[in-house]
């Protein structure tokens, strides 16, 4: 029994909780989709929020020196990434930060590359900013996603790619990219004059002995064309507080980024976000270690159960609390798959096609919930698909 509570299910109904929205009108459905957790928050974060609530004024705020130091300390101690405070740029979320990077480092009509399947806001951000989307398909090998570097270089060159958005660690596949992989990516970007944005929001959730490598720690030369995005929000389940950060060590890139951020009026951050992030990084190390043990147990449970009881192929993640499920062994269409999950099993998973065309006949399962709830979700899936 650990110090923290990962067995109680907080009441999320009636709180405008996006993940549980459908459950408010259909009491039978269980959500296991959007990437937030159904766990009680770190007590020190709750205390910081309560202290904030006790203030008599909720006005404009700024990033304190204490917050900046906590972010620097966390990145240094957890990931070996040391940087000057001037490199740190706060912004309300990693997805808005990606859009800002697209606007700052490319022009309308220019090509932006992503590795698919991948988190759907990548493609959306490229398209809605009127850039040309280039998709480089990941290859599945030995139960993991890999990058086809020959095809990647071909895409970079032939499509005239200006910006590469990397998901590190990868969502939905849970791949924790090794140093050698990141080195190859950086060399190609350096060779062909491509800017790179590394979305590292899942950085703290490397599991099963794997270690996250921040892109800007791989090679000092890569800092000239790369920026790193991260946040405490995914790790500590505080996405509603709205705070993330970019680390931009090249002063010219940082100036261009901040200019675009100012043009978008994205420079004012929630005081609640600042305080929650500071508390998370100051007090959250032990909580995180327990959380990762919970995730490893939950992932092993899913792998074992589906492996024994179904034809669902499970991509065991090296990190994150998200599992990529392959239903292609069943004779189904994508529409029928969704119908079975939602209407018969009464569970909500992320639709595979939302991550790209490679997601056909796939779904993404979120295991960040008390194990009793996860068991119910998985048993419903087993019951439904054992009939096929």
Regions found by a protein language model. Name each.
Residues 2, 16, 56-58, 162, ...:
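Intrinsically disordered, low-complexity segments enriched in small/polar residues
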Residues 9, 58-60, 147, 215:
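Short clusters of hydrophobic/aromatic residues that line enzyme substrate/ligand-binding pockets
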């Amino acid at each position: 029994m650990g110090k923290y509570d990962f067995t109680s299910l907080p009441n999320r109904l009636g709180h405008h909780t996006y993940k549980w929205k459908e459950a408010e009108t259909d009491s039978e459905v269980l959500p296991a989709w959007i990437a937030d957790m159904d766990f009680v928050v770190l007590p020190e974060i709750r205390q910081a929020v309560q202290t904030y609530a006790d203030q008599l004024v909720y006005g404009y705020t700024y990033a304190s020196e204490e917050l900046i130091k906590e972010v620097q300390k966390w990145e240094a101690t957890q990931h070996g990434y040391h940087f000057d405070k001037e490199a740190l740029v706060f912004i309300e979320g990693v997805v808005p930060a990606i859009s800002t990077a697209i606007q700052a480092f490319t022009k309308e009509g220019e090509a932006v590359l992503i590795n698919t399947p991948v988190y759907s806001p990548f493609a959306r951000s490229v398209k809605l900013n009127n850039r040309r989307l280039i998709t480089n398909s990941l290859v599945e090998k030995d139960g993991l996603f890999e990058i086809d570097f020959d095809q990647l270089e071909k895409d970079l060159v032939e499509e005239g790619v200006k910006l590469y958005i990397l998901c590190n660690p990868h969502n939905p596949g849970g791949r924790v990219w090794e140093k050698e992989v990141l080195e190859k990516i950086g060399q190609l970007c350096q060779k062909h004059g491509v800017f790179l944005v590394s979305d590292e929001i899942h950085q703290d959730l490397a599991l099963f002995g794997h270690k996250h490598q921040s892109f800007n720690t791989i090679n000092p030369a890569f800092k000239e064309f790369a920026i790193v995005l991260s946040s405490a929000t995914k790790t500590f389940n505080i996405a509603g507080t709205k705070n993330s950060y970019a680390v931009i060590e090249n002063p010219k890139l940082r100036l261009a980024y901040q200019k675009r951020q100012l043009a978008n009026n994205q420079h004012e951050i929630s005081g609640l976000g600042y305080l929650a992030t500071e508390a998370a990084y100051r007090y959250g190390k032990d909580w995180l270690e327990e959380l990762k043990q919970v995730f490893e147990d939950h992932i092993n449970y899913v792998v074992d159960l589906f492996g024994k009881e179904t034809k669902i192929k499970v991509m065991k993640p090296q990190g994150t609390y998200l599992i990529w499920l392959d239903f292609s062994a069943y004779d189904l269409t994508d529409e029928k798959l969704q119908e079975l999950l939602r209407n018969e099993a009464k569970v909500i998973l992320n639709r595979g096609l939302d991550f790209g065309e490679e997601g056909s006949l796939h779904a993404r399962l979120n295991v960040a919930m008390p194990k009793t709830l996860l068991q119910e979700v998985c048993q419903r899936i087993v019951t439904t698909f054992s009939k096929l």
